């Protein structure tokens, strides 16, 4: 049976301090070419100012993002289904109103 100290020696002998960087594209090819350069081009979000799209958000928008981020997958899918149903219903309503406008000749250009 092995002594308790042998496990630590074995573990120490298995450690490797070799740096596995992408210096050799033949040994370590990128799975998606260009991703490393793309990721390196962005500054750390901690040190840089917020992105342009976030500067335009209001508090209600941020609260909605936090709420959506806290939903489970099933709840998020239910929310998406509800939004799809609402968009479909709005499309039907718009179609009805456009047909109504056509029958009432509201959309015709006036004749000169």
Curated annotation (Swiss-Prot):
GO biological process: regulation of DNA-templated transcription
Record-annotated disulphide pairs: none
InterPro entries: DREAM_LIN52 (IPR018737)
Listed Pfam families: LIN52 (PF10044)
Domain of life: Eukaryota
GO annotations of cellular component type: DRM complex
PANTHER family membership: LIN52 FAMILY MEMBER, PROTEIN LIN-52 HOMOLOG
Similarity-based family: Belongs to the lin-52 family.
Assembly: Component of the DREAM complex.
UniProt protein name: Protein lin-52 homolog
């Amino acid at each position: 049976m092995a002594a308790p100290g042998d496990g630590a020696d074995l573990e120490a002998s298995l450690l490797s301090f070799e740096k596995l960087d992408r210096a050799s594209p033949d040994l370590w090819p990128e799975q998606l070419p260009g991703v490393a350069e793309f990721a390196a081009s962005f500054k750390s979000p901690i040190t840089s100012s917020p992105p342009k799209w976030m500067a335009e958000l209001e508090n209600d928008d941020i609260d909605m993002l936090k709420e959506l981020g806290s939903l489970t997958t099933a709840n998020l899918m239910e929310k998406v289904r509800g939004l799809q149903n609402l968009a479909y219903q709005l499309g039907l309503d718009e179609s009805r109103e456009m047909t109504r406008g056509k029958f009432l000749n509201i959309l015709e250009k006036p004749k000169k």
